[in-house]
Amino acid sequence: MAPFSRPHHPMIRTRFAPSPTGYLHIGGARTALFSWAFARHHGGQFVLRIEDTDIARSTPEAVQAILDGMAWLDLNHDEGPFYQTQRLYRYKEVIEQMLASGDAYHCYCSTEELDEMREAQRARGEKPRYDGRWRPEPGKTLPVPPSGVQPVVRFRNPTDGTVAWKDLVKGTIEFSNAELDDLIIARADGTPTYNFCVVVDDWDMRITHVIRGDDHVNNTPRQINILKALGATVPEYAHLSMILGDDGTKLSKRHGAVSVMQYFEEGYLPEAVINYLARLGWSHGDAELFDREQFVEWFDLDHITPSAAQFNTEKLRWLNQQYIKAADDTRLAGLARPFLIRNGATLDDGPDLAAVCALVKERAATIEALADAATLFYRVLHPTPELLAQHVTAEVRPALADLATRLETLEWERGAISAAFKETLAAHGLKMPKLAMPVRVLVTGEPQTPAIDATLELLGREKVLDRLRAAL
């Protein structure tokens, strides 16, 4: 019996089952999101399973990176994480049952024998495959097991008929059983193989819908046949097409971020990444901006496109910018703080960071860009000699001195500062850029800032006047 209880009326149960051999990448995150959203939409359950039987390549760091990525995206699971390495007893139990029932058998072929077998098949123009020499058949005499050789265990795959399923994304997919050889389900050292563990886990965990990348399509007929041999209910399958990079080739490291957490490090908001991932191969009419609650309400498998989705970094940046513009300023301040500190900003000596974020966030595509725009409010000035020579000319110095005098006594708020600029411009016959640019350079060290009146308001009267007078 499987160790998980089985309700009489099973609810929808999905799973995300990453292998911890690397970081949580964009494709994996989309699979997790769609599996999570499908379960949430139907009031079902979402299971997290870590497929860590590849001991040589699985690392604790990769497991933590996956958990961190899931937590950042807030893809909460109802059960798990389950680790396959903690379920080896269960796989061994099922293998013994299959050996006893005749659904599996021992194979003593050496690596050299298998290589020779494949070479001979290629020479005859045949598809390389296991020839079934250790497969028990009625009336067949098997070779004598060689002494001192530990056998593998192979699944006795049906040899006739077809295995087919109605894929919820790609439509009906069918394989001839004659094309499928007898899969190894346990290695010579007794460890179970990937395809077998997946089957037992999906069975035990009562998974009703398997949503995964289409690189698993070729695994599916083998897994279905094993499930049928076990007398297990076969789940529904939905295979998602691959994600292409901006240039139309398969998404890879050279297209930018390798892991989901790299987007966190670059200053993307998780809700923007969720929104973008949702639109990678799925749509709801023309809707582009929507929160996770709306996504869960809308999500279905019928509107997933069977063709490849194309990742567009600029579109993600645009989406992130929309979310930053709408975000709470206090939250943005907390997110921007580490970036500002990295920029060498002294946050104790400057205006309220939330107020600064409110001023500069309109044009910020990332939190990193937001922090870069805010840095000028929290650092020691170093305008370059070139900027000073270009903008602080003898012609404009009288107007700068006049402006400083007007700024000394007015009420320090944006409207009054703007009025002081207009009065100074009128008195000296200047256009706004002629006065605003040198003020920017002298007060912030930068030729480009947010609106000059708002910038001066946040910097404060004392700091503004000290910097103007120091130059005059």
From Swiss-Prot:
Motif ('KMSKS' region): 250-254
InterPro entries in UniProt: aa-tRNA-synth_I_cd-bd, aa-tRNA-synth_I_codon-bd_sub2, aa-tRNA-synth_I_CS, aa_tRNA-synth_I_cd-bd_sf, Glu-tRNA-ligase_bac/mito, Glu/Gln-tRNA-synth, Glu/Gln-tRNA-synth_Ib_cat-dom, GluQ/Sye
Chain positions covered by the region annotation Disordered: 122-150
Keywords, comma-separated and alphabetical: Aminoacyl-tRNA synthetase, ATP-binding, Cytoplasm, Ligase, Nucleotide-binding, Protein biosynthesis
Catalytic activity reported: tRNA(Glu) + L-glutamate + ATP = L-glutamyl-tRNA(Glu) + AMP + diphosphate
Binding site for ATP: 253
Positions of short motif 'HIGH' region: 18-28
UniProt superkingdom: Bacteria
GO cellular component term, pick one: cytosol
Transmembrane portions of the chain: none
Protein's cellular compartments: Cytoplasm
An annotated Gene Ontology molecular function: zinc ion binding
EC number in record: 6.1.1.17
Composition skew (Basic and acidic residues), residue ranges: 122-138
Any one Gene Ontology BP term: glutamyl-tRNA aminoacylation
Broadest EC class assigned to this enzyme: ligase
PANTHER family given in the database record: GLUTAMATE--TRNA LIGASE, GLUTAMATE--TRNA LIGASE, MITOCHONDRIAL-RELATED
Purpose of the protein: Catalyzes the attachment of glutamate to tRNA(Glu) in a two-step reaction: glutamate is first activated by ATP to form Glu-AMP and then transferred to the acceptor end of tRNA(Glu).
Quaternary assembly: Monomer.
Entry similarity comment: Belongs to the class-I aminoacyl-tRNA synthetase family. Glutamate--tRNA ligase type 1 subfamily.
Protein name per Swiss-Prot or TrEMBL: Glutamate--tRNA ligase
UniProt organism field: Thiobacillus denitrificans (strain ATCC 25259 / T1)
Gene symbol of the encoding locus: gltX
